[in-house]
């Protein structure tokens, strides 16, 4: 009996550790995503019943059940110290406090908007379909593409090397 209790306690610890493993890739549809630098990984969803949250292929996605009307409809607070990828549709990104990362990819579509303060070695940004993004901070390399009446404001971003800054008219 003692061995079974120890086994179950160990199994519970392993499952809890795996569940709290920090996620580094995010997708949002219809949400305001607020990223806050923190050594402790934590996520708070304003009203979890409004949407679905799913982890698949190392991407944590937040998708509203009702995609009609004005967006965003709910807010997600993400406390983390490491982000690799943020993808958004009909959403808003808020990261006013600086994040220090090696590489970051941000993709905005369908009228998404936001502000990102970052210190990165490599920063890839893609904005499409009327999206607006303000970048602050610094990066060694910036790879930026805009399409379909979108804009990326880099006035407050110090860039050492701009590998691509292209605008495609569609």
Each model region followed by its residue ranges:
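Intrinsically disordered, low-complexity terminal regions
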Residues: 1-109, 113-128, 132-170
